[in-house]
C-alpha cells in the first residue's frame, strides 16, 4: 500500500524512498570531515601569516565600514543564493562535487560566524 504525505501543498510517496538514521549519521560524519579538511586547506590562503584566523573578516569589515559578522554574512549570502538557485533549477542536474562544494562552504561560513560571535562575547 502506498502512503502519501503532503508538504507545502506537494504530494509525496514514501515507497522506496527513505533514508535510515545510520545513513544520515554517515552523511553527517562525511560532511564534518569535508568541512574540517576545507577549513584547514584554506587557512593559509585566507590568513597568510596572520595568526588571527578571523583576520580576513575583520579586514573586510574595515573596508566596508561594518562589523565582521555583517562582512561574513555578505560572503555567505553568495553561497546561499547559489544553493537556492541549484535547488530550484528546473532542468539542471548538478554533480555531487558541486553540491559538496556549495554545502561545505556554506557550513564553514556558519562555523566561522560562530567563532566571530564567540570572540565578541569573550572580549
Question: What are these model-predicted stretches?
Answer:
Residues 1-3, 7-8:
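Targeting/processing segments of secretory and organellar proteins
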Residues 8-123:
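Intrinsically disordered, low-complexity regulatory regions
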Amino acid at each position: 500500500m502506498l502512503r502519501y504525505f503532503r508538504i507545502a501543498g506537494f504530494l509525496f510517496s514514501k515507497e522506496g524512498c527513505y533514508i535510515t538514521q545510520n545513513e544520515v549519521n554517515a552523511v553527517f560524519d562525511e560532511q564534518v570531515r569535508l568541512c574540517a579538511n576545507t577549513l584547514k586547506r584554506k587557512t593559509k590562503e585566507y590568513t597568510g601569516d596572520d595568526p588571527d584566523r578571523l583576520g580576513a573578516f575583520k579586514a573586510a569589515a574595515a573596508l566596508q565600514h561594518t562589523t565582521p559578522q555583517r562582512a561574513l554574512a555578505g560572503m555567505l549570502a553568495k553561497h546561499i543564493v547559489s544553493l537556492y538557485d541549484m535547488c530550484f533549477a528546473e532542468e539542471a542536474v548538478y554533480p555531487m562535487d558541486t553540491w559538496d562544494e556549495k554545502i561545505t562552504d556554506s557550513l564553514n561560513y556558519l562555523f566561522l560566524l560562530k567563532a566571530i560571535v564567540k570572540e565578541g562575547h569573550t572580549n
